[in-house]
Swiss-Prot record:
Start and end residues of each stretch annotated as Interaction with DDX6: 219-240
Main location: cytoplasm
Chain spans, region Interaction with LSM14A: 448-490, 940-985
Swiss-Prot/TrEMBL GO biological process terms: miRNA-mediated gene silencing by inhibition of translation; mRNA stabilization; negative regulation of deadenylation-dependent decapping of nuclear-transcribed mRNA; negative regulation of neuron differentiation; negative regulation of translation; neuron differentiation; P-body assembly; positive regulation of nuclear-transcribed mRNA poly(A) tail shortening
Species of provenance: Homo sapiens (Human)
Motif (Nuclear export signal): 438-447, 613-638
UniProt protein name: Eukaryotic translation initiation factor 4E transporter
Crosslinked positions (Glycyl lysine isopeptide (Lys-Gly) (interchain with G-Cter in SUMO2)): 410
Family: Belongs to the 4E-T/EIF4E-T family.
Biased composition (Low complexity): 736-746
Subcellular location(s) of the protein: Cytoplasm, P-body; Cytoplasm; Nucleus; Nucleus, PML body
Disordered, as annotated region: 1-24, 208-230, 664-693, 707-803, 922-953
Ubl conjugation listed as a keyword: yes
Gene Ontology CC: cytoplasm; cytosol; intracellular membrane-bounded organelle; membrane; nuclear speck; nucleus; P-body; PML body
Amino acid sequence: MDRRSMGETESGDAFLDLKKPPASKCPHRYTKEELLDIKELPHSKQRPSCLSEKYDSDGVWDPEKWHASLYPASGRSSPVESLKKELDTDRPSLVRRIVDPRERVKEDDLDVVLSPQRRSFGGGCHVTAAVSSRRSGSPLEKDSDGLRLLGGRRIGSGRIISARTFEKDHRLSDKDLRDLRDRDRERDFKDKRFRREFGDSKRVFGERRRNDSYTEEEPEWFSAGPTSQSETIELTGFDDKILEEDHKGRKRTRRRTASVKEGIVECNGGVAEEDEVEVILAQEPAADQEVPRDAVLPEQSPGDFDFNEFFNLDKVPCLASMIEDVLGEGSVSASRFSRWFSNPSRSGSRSSSLGSTPHEELERLAGLEQAILSPGQNSGNYFAPIPLEDHAENKVDILEMLQKAKVDLKPLLSSLSANKEKLKESSHSGVVLSVEEVEAGLKGLKVDQQVKNSTPFMAEHLEETLSAVTNNRQLKKDGDMTAFNKLVSTMKASGTLPSQPKVSRNLESHLMSPAEIPGQPVPKNILQELLGQPVQRPASSNLLSGLMGSLEPTTSLLGQRAPSPPLSQVFQTRAASADYLRPRIPSPIGFTPGPQQLLGDPFQGMRKPMSPITAQMSQLELQQAALEGLALPHDLAVQAANFYQPGFGKPQVDRTRDGFRNRQQRVTKSPAPVHRGNSSSPAPAASITSMLSPSFTPTSVIRKMYESKEKSKEEPASGKAALGDSKEDTQKASEENLLSSSSVPSADRDSSPTTNSKLSALQRSSCSTPLSQANRYTKEQDYRPKATGRKTPTLASPVPTTPFLRPVHQVPLVPHVPMVRPAHQLHPGLVQRMLAQGVHPQHLPSLLQTGVLPPGMDLSHLQGISGPILGQPFYPLPAASHPLLNPRPGTPLHLAMVQQQLQRSVLHPPGSGSHAAAVSVQTTPQNVPSRSGLPHMHSQLEHRPSQRSSSPVGLAKWFGSDVLQQPLPSMPAKVISVDELEYRQ
């Protein structure tokens, strides 16, 4: 026993600290020498009557056997090989319950006689499992048990499976059910086996015991170790392990037996006979202490074991307050360690800790200090271990952030209490913020600091992070919550915060930097630095934003959205919508393609003034956009290739097309994502269904969603943005994207030098920034009449906006690709608008083809028009409307030529070269992919819809231009072309 006692003194200072004579709770610590002396005392030599002879080895009560009886399942517990084998017999059935994959694999071996090292046999008793349950009894046990338990987790221990490991595995499985039965049976086994084998083999036994009854086949590290991340391994010597094992055994005994202390006495008594009479006393309390660690012994006095050492969170800035919050309502949700957090001496200090918590600080600002203590008064002891006084340092967290940000908290706090209940409820959800989340929140706050305008952003983060934290801290004081809630509610009231919590508040919400807020300075850099554009693909977004961004404001939007299917999304989103331009143009440079786009929703309140539709955008849609954006890299690369390689081959385009199709499917499937374009947030938000895999959303459902969203948008947006993007727009956006992707390269190539230069300039600028787009537009499109029924946002550059806002410039919509899709009926809104402008929808195709559109005609409607309706390459722009874009009637593109252009980008109307260049400049962003060589090819993003018919890209291979040129009969809006069906699927 000296070994054990020594082990205790050495390894378990903690144990010794905890030890006290059971009678008097005053702790008594034995020194190693004392224990050794005790070993030699006559009392130590006496055999207590309570010790059963069945645990004798060589006439001496063997604690090892006794422990083995306690945990039959642990190999250690059974020093005897045969015993282990018997235990192994249990293994098969137990193994089946084992979760560990390795063990599961072993199950297959159960019926196979394995090499002796494995000793895995099929059949047998299930005692081991019971043991395992016993073993896992107390956390301290787990520490050393971790070593044992690892049996189940052993890596590479295929061959080295000792009974012990099996037992461990079983321990992991159903322990409690068979506990008593197994223990008794195990005891019997061990008894017989020990008597039989250990009659005089004490030497062997001792050796084994020295190894902690490991069979010495496996190194300690091999089979021993934590079985879960929460466990810790205490590295100790073998003796220490034995000692700990003894403690565990005692603990288990105490737990198991009605008289816990008797059990300990028994084991200790036995031990005492071997050599440790007084250790009994010391260890019993130790066991008590150990159990409490498992929260098993509530009676432990707070001062017994000081966990402050472990949980001294003072050094950790926010942890203390967070833990406090978590533990806040000790009775309700006190952690299992809460018992050890109740140092009576500190119980009174809770208020001080609260006083220093950031929330309290906020409350102080709001004058809510009184409320702080409300939830946690009873839980003062729980927080006691954490030095509460130091929390003053921690308070920096939110309050300091806000102050640094120069956010005026007082107004916000004034109404914080309103939200208290709501936050409280949410706090009960028990959400715990991960470090990343907290950091994200803080980052948001920092952004706030830098951009005061972005207070909403900050507020949202505050709400999000704090609410999450408060969820953590639910237990934390209501008062704290109150302050925070007030803050949040105030923000909401002021419109800074979305009135309803975002469904998907995640990085995207963080990304929703104030930048997106139209009027606000764009903290793009801050956002990017802080968030690293986590959601957005920085590369793709930059690429897209560069390529597309410079091409058109819409493309800029695309750039913003870049992560989301850039072209398709933008197309679907009303590229022309002034909404985009407005927020965008004011600070074209400021917008980072990725984050901005995300920003769109979070500030619905803010943005709404900009575009009513924005509010409609749901965060989900934003998320969808972001998700879609993630899928973009390939498409972006392809698009980039198209953009940079004028002759980007048809096959490549097709590939792009597939990519777009997939992406678009996602987008299209997402109910309204595409039309979202109107919403100022660049991301065509995908609605919730977008969360669903497009393949799971019925086409009819998607269509309906689009229709409803389209209608809702058309009302508000009709004034400012071409509502042409209708469901058709969305449906065809994919085709358009394809077309546009092919068209720009061809445009580059075909357009006259002027066009090429412009396009190249566009490309360069596109790489540069949205601002460059604006400039470009200004240069090239300033000439354009902005008045044409288009609202020219007086933003940074009216011209750029114009092209977006309304395809006022009736750019020749050169559906360079035959519009193979059945023409969808024009959206009723479009029809009405067209009629209002004196154009009968039926005449539209011919008008467009002839290019004889009334000057006032707003082609933005055409966006929703399917290519098939428009049918032929359009040169809709009357010279008057767009002098630049005067298509020369003499050079109408034939579809065959268009196809060739698609393939070779060879054709461009001679006269349209420069104009087309301008147009393509506008549309290139969208058209970038578009195949038609004509710069005007879909030069109007607005016309994208008509250009949409990119299906011909693929069809041109199979059908002659004559066939492709023929406009398909227009079909009812409900009818979906095969192409669309395919896309949707």
